[in-house]
From Swiss-Prot:
CDD domains: CAP_ED. The segment S4 is probably the voltage-sensor and is characterized by a series of positively charged amino acids. The pore-forming region H5 is enclosed by the transmembrane segments S5 and S6 in the Shaker-type (1P/6TM) and contains the GYGD signature motif which seems to be involved in potassium selectivity. Disulfide bonds: none annotated. It comes from Oryza sativa subsp. japonica. This is Potassium channel KAT2. Its main location: membrane.
Amino acid sequence: METISNIFHNDPLPPLGARANQSIKLRKFIISPYDSRYRTWETFLLVLVVYSAWICPFELAYLRNLSWKVSLVDNIIDSFFAIDIILTFFLAYLDQKSYLLVDDPKRIVARYFSSWFLFDVCSTIPYQLLGQIFKKHENGLAYRLLSMLRLWRLRRLSELFARLEKDIRLNYYWIRCTKLISVTLFAVHCSGCFNYLIADRYPNPARTWIGAAIPNYRSQNLWVRYVTAIYWSITTLTTTGYGDLHAENQREMLFSICYMLFNLGLTAYLIGNMTNLVVQGSCRTRNFRDTIHAASQFAARNQLPGHIKDEMLSHICLRYKTEGLKQKETLDSLPKGIRSSIACNLFLPVIEKVYLFHGVSFTCMIQLVTEMEAEYYPPREVVILQNEAPRDVYILVSGAVEERVEIDGTEKVQEVLCNGEIFGEIGVICSIPQPCAFHTIKVSQLLRLNTAVLKNIIKENSDDRRVILNNLSQKMNQDHRFSTEVMEKSLQMMHQHFGEYNRCSALNQDNEKNELKANNGHSMALEWKRVTIHMYSQRNKRPEAPLAKVINLPGSLDKLFAIACQKFNNYRLTKLVNPEFAEIDDITVIRDGDHLFFMEI
């Protein structure tokens, strides 16, 4: 399990050929930015950054005379960031061009000096301590203004939120809200402190925004003064403006003008981001309601029957519920190899149970699985109509589907299909109108396979084609729901379409088996590999080569040499090579149409 600090970082892209668990080897004394100890150190610094962001404006406005406790805490925090500067000189960095970690000390130092080194040093110098060392103006405004450079550390928080927003383990909505709230609180805190600083530095305390409301405000408790400043800041930011606290002099007026101009941009930023988050959350629901309303109006305008309207609304509701799965969009965005692996993992166990594919090769199974698409259907949904043109084959994964046949104007339920059964295959393979209708009984998940895709796969795999056609023939012979005319027509169309027509009928199973065996033997003969053999002799410089011979490839190399000796009886054959003069020692590597060369040495 990864530690909590791991979510703050993005690991480097591994080079091609690297193993998933390959460790990163760096030079001695060089720190990896992805080391767990360094990540813990960075997480600790983030806590100190939050403290610095709050204390810097507060010290500038309210703490004219720093106590030794506050000064000690500030110096300790500065020392931690000074240590981080030293560590950065030994910290490897990720090259944005090669995406490799650079561990060359010279390059690390050069990069740091040319980037954030000067800013990090200026934000780490203990200016208050320097004032105390010089014994003059130790708590002067100049030193306190220089201490505001510590706000440069906020860039670490900005990088943190940028990483958190990309972390899929965290809720993006709440990360964005946290960021917006943090920006708002920091702006309110800084503006309140700055406005109090202006009033505190004004010569006439009575003519200040806080002095007009609270006479002798400097004698008040620190908490009262801070809350009053924050109250003014938040009412101005939200444009509430009760009027009880307002600018009394030109300095405060100028600051109020600048603050309100800043508020215009900040408010636009906050409202724009929040609106975007809210719209993203409600847009899907609004589109669903609009679709339901449009479908209802369509049904009412065209006076559709109630059951058709219910089917429309059920389909829309199911699509809305399953939209979050986004199966097709997710799979389409992946490479073909990953899609094939996912499809095999999800659908291959289901395909193996289908009677139509019993006995087919694993290669054919893979081809079928990768072309299937998963779909959801609501209850009482019509999947296939009777006598419609065959378009798709469906396999039931979950749910229930009933098979209906209309006889003499009356629709009857013939069978209820369960998980792992296929339907629509008779019309598709036999190229006839669908003999039955299929309706879902409850919410069902189906695998859909296009007609053209299925036929192409069957045609490309001759051995599997015979197995599939044989399985379908046996299924139809065992099924007594179809008439003899329908069965004979289906079998005839099936074999005519795939070029394997036989005269079997559903009424004579013995003749069908004998005919199928004869056809299988004939097909095997047609599928023998044909090769062209040549004679190549090295005994003479310019031999008269005999004509090449086209033969059927036998089952072994010994038989092949025997045939070649008969064809080239005047030569002594010693070796068999391919056109690239690579020796062949296995009959299985020879393909249909290859040119083989027998050598005489």
